[in-house]
A protein has these predicted regions:
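Active-site-adjacent structural elements that line small-molecule/cofactor binding pockets in enzymes
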Residues: 1-273
């Protein structure tokens, strides 16, 4: 019989329409301290430069997480997620190891293959097809682990290369900071199940999404089945993450269900499910 995993809540610090926007260093530090004081496990910062075509700037994740680390003592620090096409892999490895060292081992390292072609185009990057982007993510994950190992790097991949030096500094968390990979399709979730420490279910819907009329609960169960099958014996050690993008914290659940139901034209029983 496996022991239950601890149930944790994290905060994603968005800077965008309708979100509270820290406009000064003091405001951001205060937000981080408040997040810690309220008992949240992790403060996560995205790796985005524009939104879906809208000019929406986000805080640069590494700088923001460094400020949050200096303002707190126990709050974990999540990059959610670092797009592998936006960073030189060897540099990202060193930056994350440094952040883990200087935060006394509080980093959670989210890794993603990229998804927003508008953002790629705006930044002058080529948006390759999904198989190539996912293959690069897997190679970058291997390079990160090689850096964190303390052994001389000898990585010669199609998409990620680093060789002839020892990755320093080493992270405090051994063998490496917890790695999170998320997605909604079978291939990426299966990779996450085999390789990551945290598996994130992306975009679980609030209404039926296909011609089979599946509910969000049924979709989530299907994805969990993919993860269980791919993870095998390591499933019990995984953290499973979900992101409720539409969240209402209230003591009046009936009104909350009604609001979501109207917004998405979904029956109340589907929302409750």
């Amino acid at each position: 019989m496996t022991s239950p995993r601890p149930f944790r809540f994290a905060v994603q610090a968005h800077v965008g329409p309708g979100a509270p926007i820290p406009t000064t260093a003091r405001e951001f530090r205060e937000m981080a301290r408040r997040t810690e004081a309220l008992g949240y496990s992790t403060l996560c910062v995205g790796d985005h430069y524009i939104d879906r075509g809208r000019i929406t700037q986000y805080l640069a994740p590494l700088s923001a997480l460094g400020v949050a680390a200096g303002a707190t003592t126990t709050l974990r620090l999540g990059g959610r997620v670092f797009c592998v096409d936006y960073h030189v892999p060897a540099v990202l490895a060193k930056e994350m190891a440094t952040l883990d060292l200087l935060s006394d081992g509080r980093v959670e390292l989210g890794l993603g293959a990229g998804w927003n072609p508008v953002e790629y185009e705006a930044m002058g990057l080529t948006f390759h097809d999904a198989p190539q982007r996912v293959a690069k993510m897997v190679e970058v994950l291997g390079l990160l682990r090689a850096h964190f190992s303390g052994e001389e790097l000898d990585v010669h991949g199609v998409h990620a290369t680093a060789a002839g030096y020892i990755g320093l500094p080493l992270p405090v968390q051994r063998p490496h900071p917890p790695i999170m990979i998320g997605g909604g399709r079978k291939r990426v979730l299966s990779i996450a199940a085999r390789e990551a420490d945290i598996v994130s279910f992306a975009n679980v819907p609030v209404i039926a999404i296909d011609d089979q009329g599946r509910t969000p609960h049924q979709v989530a169960r299907e994805r969990l089945g993919w993860v269980q099958a791919a993870a095998g014996d390591r499933f019990a050690s995984l953290d499973i993450e979900a992101s409720p993008y539409f969240l209402s914290i209230t003591d009046d659940p009936t009104s909350a269900v009604d609001a979501v139901s109207k917004r998405f034209n979904a029956p109340p029983d589907i929302v409750l499910d």
